[in-house]
A protein has these predicted regions:
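Donor nucleotide-sugar binding/catalytic pocket of nucleotide-sugar-dependent glycosyltransferases
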Residues: 126-141, 145-163
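A charged, aromatic-enriched C-terminal amphipathic alpha-helix characteristic of glycosyltransferases
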Residues: 30-33, 342-373
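Short hydrophobic beta-strand element within catalytic cores of glycosyltransferases
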Residues: 296-303
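Conserved donor-binding/catalytic core segment of Leloir-type glycosyltransferases
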Residues: 6, 167-184, 188-192, 196, ...
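Extended catalytic core of nucleotide-activated donor transferases of GT-like folds
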Residues: 37, 52-139
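Nucleotide-activated donor-binding/catalytic signature segment of Leloir-type glycosyltransferases, i.e.
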Residues: 218-265
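Nucleotide-sugar-dependent
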Residues: 276-291, 306, 310-311
Length: 380
């Protein structure tokens, strides 16, 4: 089949342009990794893939042709739109307007609503796909114009395939946090000193783009904008924590920047625990690729049961009930046990690694092909 995969400017411009001839040089988010992994997975299965996005240049790699947006804007030139079998837009359904109804048009929605989409966007989509059923239901609740019968679930994939090398590294007593800082880092800042008091060798390694977020949200004081005000409180609290504890290991705390995926693999594989006391201001986590990556890396994921986490990772990760505010002691006790109980580590690690193999890029691509086949049978 011939695929058009579109990663639009609304999602890609804040993070691009991307070097598609060396994508490994980027520190990709879970959604970005999913896109580029599907480009590779579908081409590896023998399909022709034209990838449209905010690239540094036009580039051909085997069965993949990368087409950059023209003129530095959102102009997308599609050679012969009717020649495609399937067009998939990542979170931006407006790009599907150019394709005729003869092309199967899918929108893979990673965001939590559609306020940026143009009027009538839903009329140009044959199927909306969501990473979890809870995410699907949330988006439908805030976007009633979408027909529930035109929706489905297609889970994300691992951000990297380098986890399954069989190599095992010394994990020490390292705890890692590698998600957006607004989603729960403030709780970890409260919990870690208590953990370190009981496990003196404990280290906390924080990844992702903390400083840009802190500089922006640390100035948010307006109580009439509750979501921004809440983030401002979190930013100032975490800033005070790093000021007190240091960022280079003085008190066991290390603040890292966003890093390329291969470095993130190494960081997760050398960590004993992924601690994610997720507590978003609004619905945020429709899947949580960082948790999936931790599963594959053999780090013990300790997460809160919010948004889609219980649905996706229940029975695999250690999922603590409710929001962290109602389970402070449980969070500290669980992290201490995960750092010190080798039997628990072996049990959880084995379970998580087996779970993660269901989410390789090849497995996700094959599921997509089944979805496409089913849609075609229904249309016949």
């Amino acid at each position: 089949m011939k695929f058009a995969l579109i990663y639009g400017l609304f999602c890609s411009k804040p993070r691009g342009p991307y070097r598609v001839d060396n994508i490994a040089s980027h520190g990709l988010t879970g959604s970005e990794s999913f896109y580029f992994n599907m480009v590779k997975a579908l081409s590896d299965l023998g399909h022709q893939v034209d990838a449209f996005g905010f690239w540094t240049k036009e580039h051909v790699d085997g069965l993949v042709h990368y087409y950059p947006f023209t003129g530095g804007g959102d102009d997308m030139h599609v050679p012969e739109p009717a020649s495609y079998d399937v067009a998939i837009a990542w979170s931006e359904p407006d790009y599907l307007r150019v394709f005729p109804p003869s092309v199967l048009r899918l929108c893979e929605q990673q965001l939590n609503d559609f306020p940026y989409a143009g009027e009538g966007f839903e009329k140009h989509v044959d199927l909306f796909l969501f990473p979890s059923d809870i995410h699907r239901k949330h988006v439908l609740s805030v976007t009633p114009r979408i027909d529930p019968g035109k929706t489905g679930v297609w889970g994300n994939c691992l951000s990297n395939e380098d986890y399954f090398t069989g190599k095992e590294q010394d994990r020490g007593k390292r705890i890692i946090y590698c998600s957006s800082p607004d989603r729960g880092l403030h709780w970890l800042c409260e919990f870690f000193p208590k953990v370190r008091a009981r496990v003196p060798e404990a280290e906390l390694h924080v990844y992702y783009r903390y400083m840009p977020w802190y500089r922006q949200m640390g100035q948010a004081w307006d109580p009439h904008n509750p979501p921004a005000h809440a983030q401002g409180m979190r930013a100032r609290y975490t800033g005070a924590f790093f000021y007190k504890m240091g960022t280079d290991g003085e008190s066991g705390v290390f603040l890292h920047d966003s890093v390329p995926n291969q470095q993130m693999v190494a960081a997760l594989e050398s960590s004993r625990v992924l601690a994610y006391p997720c507590d978003p201001v609004v619905f945020t986590e429709g899947f949580g690729v960082s948790v999936l990556d931790a599963c594959a890396a053999g780090a013990i994921p300790i997460i809160s049961d919010v948004d889609a986490f219980g649905e996706v990772y229940g029975g695999t990760a250690i999922v603590l009930e409710g929001r962290p505010a109602s389970s402070r002691d449980a969070w500290v006790d669980t992290m201490v046990r995960a750092l010190t109980d080798d039997t628990l580590q072996q049990e959880i690690t084995s379970r998580c690694k087996a779970f993660s193999r269901k989410f390789t890029r090849k497995a996700r691509a094959k599921q997509l092909l089944k979805i496409i086949s089913s849609l075609r049978k229904e249309a016949a």
